Amino acid sequence: MKKCDAYVAVRGAYNATENSDIPSDHLAMYSRTLRPVLNYRVNKTRWVVIRWPNGSMAQGAGMSTEAFEDFFFRVCTMDYARMAKAQRPLIKRMAKADKVHLKGPGTDLTFSIKGLGAVGCAGDRNIPDGEVFSCPVKKSVNGVIQYNTPSIYAGTRFENMRLEFKNGKIVDATASDTKRINEIFDTDPGARYVGEFSLGFNPHIKEPMCDILFDEKIAGSLHFTTGQAYKECDNGNRSAVHWDMVLIQRPEYGGGEVWFDDVLIRRNGQFVPKDLKPLNPTRLK
């Protein structure tokens, strides 16, 4: 990796659950071994990650291959310069915010992002793209979050993930495979703390497909990520794990709200303040 001038990843897995039968301790060893390489690539190189559409991805999205290819190229070729401009007010608001409050069915979570900054993503390193992220103060997270989007991590598919936090740490975790999810969170001490908070707003991505490059950008979504923090918004958390788990807050998924310092930022997947409305799907397409 240190000999690379740039890193371009074109990925198209044919079996997202290929590692589902590998013991958790082996996967943890793999993650710990790979993490220094990933950290160098993310922090020290010029890089971009994209997919190549195939039948497996179409199946995950519940589409025919032809329909998925049309969707894929529509998403990947949208006007990212327009997105970059539209997200600037959200970057400013997030960078200045202190207290964040997430509300929704089964979710009541508070944390601080004070002093950790915010980063906008509009096609520079991910294609597709569409998010603004920050990071919680490590020990500020308290409450419960109930995710409503399936997630594949370390080869295992998880559904109905529910995490309870006390002073930043996951003190209770349940899911469709509760044993496996806790084994992942026991990879290292940092895996039970949070390394990223992000709001997603790509207007073309509406439904989950168990591919996080797409799912974390879903319009009206957020992701609250356990494990390793990014250097751009660094709360000091270190882990071999970086698990983006997605909560969709549009009405058909139960709705929900995002508050910054007692100001309503988004309700039921729609941005509320006037300066953020250009990020709503009907305006951003």
Identify the role of each PLM range:
Residues 1-142, 279-285:
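Active-site bordering "gate/hinge" segments
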Residues 172-238:
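Dual-mode signal for accessory low-complexity, basic/Gly-rich regions
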Residues 210-284:
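Internal helix-turn-beta structural module
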Residues 142, 158-160, 167, 192-196, ...:
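Active-site lining segments that contact anionic ligands and/or coordinate catalytic metals
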Residues 138-183:
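Long, well-ordered mid-to-C-terminal structural blocks that present hydrophobic/aromatic surfaces
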Residues 102, 164, 258:
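Short aromatic-centered micro-motifs
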Residues 13-15, 54, 107, 116, ...:
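Short, glycine-/Ser/Thr-/acidic-enriched flexible segments
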Residues 144, 151-157, 162, 268-285:
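Charge-rich, low-complexity intrinsically disordered segments
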